[in-house]
């Protein structure tokens, strides 16, 4: 189900976009095609590396086997 606030945001988005003047970015330059292709390629390489690192760090690890064969003094039933 869509939250009513999200619908209101989507309806007001064109109004906000219409109020911005075109070319209002001072000091912004256009990106050359090789630079844009390099950014996309770097993102394509970095994203799977980040996902893989998060997967390796977040996966459940096997806990080492508890030493049930140990003899416990002062613990009845364990020895």
Swiss-Prot record:
Topology with respect to the bilayer: Single-pass type I membrane protein
UniProt modified residues of type Phosphotyrosine: 72
> Which residue spans adopt a coiled-coil conformation according to this UniProt entry?
none
GO terms for MF = phosphatidylinositol 3-kinase binding; signaling receptor binding
Q: Which InterPro entries match?
A: HCST
Subcellular location(s) of the protein: Membrane
Q: Where is this region: PIK3R1 binding site?
A: 72-75
Q: A Gene Ontology biological process annotation?
A: regulation of immune response
Which residue positions does the secretion signal occupy? Answer: 1-18
Q: What is this protein called?
A: Hematopoietic cell signal transducer
The organism is: Macaca mulatta (Rhesus macaque)
């Amino acid at each position: 189900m869509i939250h009513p606030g999200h619908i209101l945001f989507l309806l007001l988005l064109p109004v906000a976009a219409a109020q911005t003047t075109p070319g209002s970015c001072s000091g912004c330059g256009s990106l050359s095609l090789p630079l844009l292709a390099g950014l996309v390629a770097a993102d394509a390489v970095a994203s799977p590396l980040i996902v893989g690192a998060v997967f390796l760090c977040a996966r459940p690890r096997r806990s080492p086997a508890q030493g049930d064969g140990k003899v416990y003094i002062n613990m009845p039933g364990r020895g």
